[in-house]
Amino acid sequence: MSEAEARPSNFIRQIIDEDLASGKHTTVHTRFPPEPNGYLHIGHAKSICLNFGIAQDYQGQCNLRFDDTNPVKEDIEYVESIKNDVQWLGFNWSGDICYSSDYFDQLFAYAVELINKGLAYVDELSADEIREYRGSLTAPGKNSPYRDRSVEENLALFEKMRAGGFEEGKACLRAKIDMASPFIVMRDPVLYRIKFAEHHQTGNKWCIYPMYDFTHCISDALEGITHSLCTLEFQDNRRLYDWVLDNITIPVHPRQYEFSRLNLEYTVMSKRKLNLLVTDKHVEGWDDPRMPTISGLRRRGYSASSIREFIKRIGVTKQDNTIEMASLESCIREDLNENAPRAMAVIDPVKLVIENYPQGESELVTMPNHPSKPEMGSREVPFSAEIWIDRADFREEANKQYKRLVMGKEVRLRNAYVIKAERVEKDTEGNITTIFCSYDAETLSKDPADGRKVKGVIHWVSAAHALPVEIRLYDRLFSVPNPGAAEDFLATINPESLLIKQGYAEPSLKNAETGKAYQFEREGYFCLDSRYATATKLVFNRTVGLRDTWAKAGE
């Protein structure tokens, strides 16, 4: 199979293949242009993987360009976060990082060119009046009374805007196109507005800032972008993209292509809604493991490779659709099942005492770090007469489907002995506090000599050697598949999206590394938390369960 045949195909790659075959382009140059006004989420990961992935596959280039045209909402903190997220996902940008603000002088010159051609004018309508004059989908707009100013007057007023001679909101520069256009984006869109705010890159040099639609296409052209890839909501904006480039003196005219954005069940992607979750303290911050942000997914324990695999599986189309959360969870579950070392931790502990085991003694039990990967080695886990097991792994009475410990019956302790429940001790409220058992000393990691069958296996932790751990059971943040469609999306927050448990773990986890994934046997996949874990306190986040419990609940 050739390299081209091995690449995933989609309509964008087909366009690129045709452009290269026809000689329209000899190389491929893409860009990822986020605005540094927030943290990236998994929807951005689709654009990152698409733009950087195409550049990699075609031996081309991909720029990281910050669309930094609104100093009021932007911050250097977001710049650094975005750079980190792109690199964590496994990509590197070509050359130096680009900023739209790098081109402010050229953008101003192109605006002056449009004025000189009679294609832009300074408007003094208020924002509300501009909105009113713009019309609607069913009614044409009407011309501003300032639309027919002379070129000389517009040049003077635009220079006055630049010099700070107008207050914010008192003037703007608009393109002179067609107020009766069926496309509202073409009804004399604003090109420049006034903002007296310090910019994180240019300081106080400017008090006028270009709008996205004016900046985006020119930045693409100046950087030699061959294929400008945007999500579908910018489809109508392509007309303005082309209009600007057609009416200025610039040698390169990139083409814009649109693809569907990523919509994911049980979450929201709107920056406004995500910000509300943070500011109203429904979550602990932008990196809360329940958030769809890349930093949140990373803290929860998602690997970069699992996110890339997810993006690869959903593909690139022009058709808007919503992806099941189970698809994302399946990718990380497959990754960690293959690569995560195993360990034992008891999340809801109850004491179990083996009465015929030598009291005060212990031994080491050898356990594989991965059941199907001997190259991952093994570890020694201490075993003693007193152990912790999970409360759900014992019942005084149970039917035949229950394959765990039952009063008077046997079960195997993982990689250790067969035990039999003999009696229990309860508190005054009837809760079991201790389970008393006997063990078969001849069954260490082997079947009973008399051939009796013991079907159930449960995990355990030696009480004398156990590490106290806080276990944070993260789940889906919302309880409905489409919270964004609800009248009040906050009312659909899942009250059990975070449950905090105090449990015990085997001593090998004492030196767990932040972010490293483990399978807690029979429980799920977990990683050491980067925020709350300390040298003296182990805090583990659940990344994902061993199976999709939501699918079962919905049946």
UniProtKB/Swiss-Prot annotation:
One of its GO terms (molecular function) is glutamine-tRNA ligase activity. ATP binds at residues 35-37, 41-47, 231, 261-262, 269-271. Residues 317-324 are annotated as: Interaction with tRNA. It is an enzyme of class 6 (ligase). Its EC number is 6.1.1.18. HAMAP family: Gln_tRNA_synth. Monomer. This is Glutamine--tRNA ligase. It comes from Enterobacter sp. (strain 638).
